[in-house]
């Protein structure tokens, strides 16, 4: 196993963060197939439980390779699954991602999750920038990025998601590798 197993389970004040697992497919499919999230899911909505399973399998595999990936997000008080997110290592940067059930928006959970991901990424490889790719009209996600101390460096290269340009939010200026993304 990875020497970073300690990151597979993290607790915040209100959240229980556990590495995504096969047992989470049904709960995460409810989230990733909900049309209200269509603009916020990499690759778009997950049409079937099988597509959700394949999507989270990719994240599961990254835990052993890089020591950090995405967690299933649960409320500590109830154990209810309310989202997915974390930091995934990509070539030259940590990709910050957070997606919460819309019924839990506006309560600070995304910021709490993102801070845990930020701490994890910094503890594993602080030399890599932490990056969030955010639609220019996604004000709530921009607010989370600001609370983490990230800066909006604007549109960068050819970065697109679902055909729309994404803003590069990061904890430092983009290097040459990211300018070409």
Where are these regions (language model features)?
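Active-site rim helix/loop that mediates acceptor-substrate recognition in acyltransferases
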Residues: 45-67, 76
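Acyl-donor (CoA/ACP) binding surface of acyl/acetyltransferases
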Residues: 1-40, 57, 70-181
